[in-house]
Regions:
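Glycine-rich flexible loops
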Residues: 1-470
Length: 470
């Protein structure tokens, strides 16, 4: 197609290929599902979209076709069956890219009914079809996504109804769910869309896990929506900024490789969505190397910045925590991740011990973190985790930093923050910190499986498997 330019095409295909592969690696699509779309940076009347029947996780150059906004072009014949939906999404001001994927937890929570409200909040009928809101109950999802419209469609694949409703939802929200079909997101770049998709899936996985563990997630979602995310989760989440990545204040290849390996592992394993969380290493008495993400797929840049340990005006919550850790303890490395299952397990344990008011009305239920023996913990039940650490420290999202530091001291560098994620600290290396956040997700998964077996099949309760520690 004239006007797109060879240079633009050379940039577009690798980015779409890497994005599609990243989604596939995190089980966001089957072999032939989903679609990606991106505005041409030169010819603004053109967008590029994956072809119908292409393998989004293994794209080849001919799988990406150009389509015009203004008129029918040769690309329309090969483009995804949902190309008209993407055409309208990309007409939204500021929308340079859009993605539709089939993430498992996001689709699973969309199977809800107004009589149940197990995962979603019922909003009413739209032309005879039910409409819901997916309200994330975790800090990252609440800040980044807010309310995610979730619609029921008579024809939920490539229909005129979808063409009319999805762009309308995305004009006000970065993401929307199609019942039984999956999320659509829009953003300023494919990188931002991947970031948003990951948060949708992580927040859905957390919501589902917490609900199945007995947490009244509906009450929690209503409370967050009523109070607003800033009041409920005062630790603001930094907005996605592509300019934050690609800067390296070290030339040491071993250091760069270590940070990249941790980011790739966390991404592929679902420990943290792309461009969430953070990592650092203390390198001198007064300085650290700081990476503003704990997660990135192959082909996507991270960043490593050399920063002073002293707090500076404008530091966000995570950066302040890294700096405080190095000033007040002898740890040398730290990783903070969104850890959806661990975060959900933290919510469940707090609800079991203190009641739902501890989550819905945290100001009315004070938690005591001062006693090194009697404070909130999550007890692993799998052999390896018990061997490593028979108790993992647990804090609510409003715990003072000093309490979190105590948990890391008392529990070998491991702490879960209910509604927020996981923190791992290493005495010497980043790998030690990585072990803790990786183990946190496994600990939660095993506990949740045993709980479901107990509830559904009469198996032994969690207490039967928990280590007898004080």
């Amino acid at each position: 197609m004239k006007g797109t330019g060879a240079g633009a095409a050379q940039q577009i295909f690798p980015l779409m290929r890497d994005t599609g592969r990243a989604i596939m690696l995190t089980r966001g699509n089957n072999t032939h599902s989903g679609n990606l779309a991106l505005r041409d940076p030169i010819d603004r009347d053109v967008f590029h979209i994956t072809a119908s029947g292409s393998q989004v996780g293994a794209l080849i150059p001919s799988d990406v076709v150009p389509v015009r906004f203004s008129r029918v072009s040769w690309g329309d014949g090969r483009a995804s069956t949902e190309s008209t939906i993407h055409r309208k999404i990309l007409a939204i001001p500021g929308a340079e890219a859009s993605i539709h994927a089939h993430y498992l937890s996001a689709i699973s929570v969309s199977f809800d009914a107004k009589e149940a409200e197990n995962f979603l909040l019922y909003e009413g009928d739209v032309q005879g079809t039910e409409e819901f809101s997916f309200v994330p109950i975790d800090r990252t999802g609440a800040w980044v996504l807010g309310r995610v419209p979730s619609g029921t469609y008579r024809e939920p694949v490539g229909s005129k109804e979808m063409e009319a409703r999805i762009p309308r939802y995305l004009a006000d929200s970065p993401a929307t769910l199609v019942k039984g079909h999956g999320p659509f997101v829009r953003g300023g770049s494919l990188q931002e869309c991947l970031h948003l998709l990951g948060i949708v899936e992580a927040s859905a996985a957390l919501l589902q896990a917490a609900r199945l563990r007995g947490v009244d997630t509906t009450a929690l979602a209503r409370r967050i929506r009523a109070a607003g995310q800033a009041a409920f989760y005062p630790m603001k989440v930094r907005a996605f900024d592509a300019a934050a990545f690609g800067t390296y204040d070290t030339r040491d290849e071993g250091t760069i490789r270590a940070f990249r390996e941790r980011a790739l592992f966390n991404f592929v394993q679902g420990i943290s969505p792309y461009a969430t969380g953070s990592m650092s290493e203390k390198i001198t008495e007064h300085e650290m190397l700081y990476c503003p993400t704990a997660s990135a797929p192959e082909g996507f840049e991270i960043a490593i910045r050399r920063l002073p340990i002293d707090a500076l005006e404008g530091d966000d919550w995570e950066l302040v925590f890294h700096k405080t850790l190095y000033r007040d303890t002898n740890h040398k490395a730290c990783i903070i991740t969104q850890s959806p299952l661990a975060s959900a397990e933290g919510l469940a344990v707090l609800a079991e011990r203190y009641g739902m008011d501890a989550l819905v009305r945290p100001g009315s239920v004070a938690l005591d973190y001062a006693d090194s023996h009697d404070h909130p913990v999550v007890k692993p039940i799998d052999a390896e985790a018990v061997y490593l650490n028979p108790r993992v420290g647990l804090c609510r999202w409003d715990a003072p930093v000093a309490a979190v530091l105590d948990m890391l001291r008392w529990h070998k560098g491991a702490c879960l923050i209910a509604g927020v994620g996981s923190i791992g600290a290493g005495k010497v290396t980043l790998e030690q910190a990585a072990h803790h956040v990786s183990s946190g997700e496994s600990i939660a998964r095993f506990r949740q499986a045993v709980h479901l077996t107990h509830v559904l099949r009469g198996g032994p309760p969690l207490s039967h498997y928990e280590p007898a520690t004080q």
